[in-house]
Amino acid sequence: RLRGAGGGANLLLYAPIDTHLEGDESDTPWVGPKVTADLLPEAKMVDDWVFGLGSSNPKAMVATLAEVFRCVREANVPLLGDLSLGFADGGMPVTIPDRGHAGMSHGILHLLNRGGSPDFCIVMKPWNWVYHEEPGMAWFKLTVWGSLGYAGVPRGTPGFRSSIVPAARVILALENWLPAYTERNTSGVVRPDGWISALRSGWPERPAFPSAATEIFFDVRVNPRTSPAEVHAQVDDFLRGLLADDPELEMEWEMYGSTPGGSTPESNWIVQSARRAWEQVEGRPYPETPDLLGGQTDGSLLRALGVPTVRMGWPWPAEGAPEEVAEGLGGMGATYIPDLMPCAEKILWAVIDTCTRPRAEMLR
């Protein structure tokens, strides 16, 4: 924490520090058919590019915010308010039971509960916009039931029912329903998408015995104006409708993880300061409607807990990498350093704008 002279606001610069993958053999084959430079937990620099697992998200954010903090300190900016620098684990949308259920924003909650709660927060994450709100998420586990079978039993034998084949029908119905959910719940700058993300059934080492259960896991994003409980109700209505349409279908479901969305009023000081910074660096007016957002971050919880928060970023993903990178999301491990510089300037502008004036002026 860089302490000001007094009378100003406490501004937190924040980024998570965890990666979404382990960076070991447990990632394959789920990340793709081969391991590329962006998936490896090893740094590799090629000209102005940095490769390695998480080098873009979150490591580029951590490095950029640390440099902004250092610049303010070394320039002896006459701060009235305090400038805090905070990083925490648990920012990736995962939950890890064998690590004390790490994930789901547990790190930022720990930080806030132990004296780190600020007046305002700037979260650095990808995309070159200023977001005043972000979605939450709701995770569901759906189990389709059949009976334990045997490959030597003819189809139609009484007492033997597949769980996998009806689960396939459920998957297709769910895939058709999710876009309608998104359209129905889109508002503000948040587009809450949903994706089927994992399947589990039976034993690969026992292919002769079809499983009595097939589990379907999916993530549904939560608009700040919609609670996780409301999302659960919408999913519940849809799945009960499937049961009504197919009496032979046997399934159960639960929401096993959730975080709320969060929104800061657009009129709030930190939102307006960040937009002024964006306009100053970009040299053009901030657009009325940026690209709609579906990605969840710790910023959602910060806002839900009452901390006015804005998300700032840079163009992402970087284009023209000189190394091969994975298709799709990959390891979020390809960073082009010049892309980060305008974002650093915007955040620095907002820091000076916020921390050099009386707190009362910003909290009117």
Q: Predicted regions: what is each one?
A:
Residues 9-11, 81, 136-138, 212-216, ...:
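Residues at beta-strand starts and edge strands
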Residues 49-52, 56-139:
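Acidic/histidine-rich catalytic neighborhood of metal-dependent amide-processing enzymes
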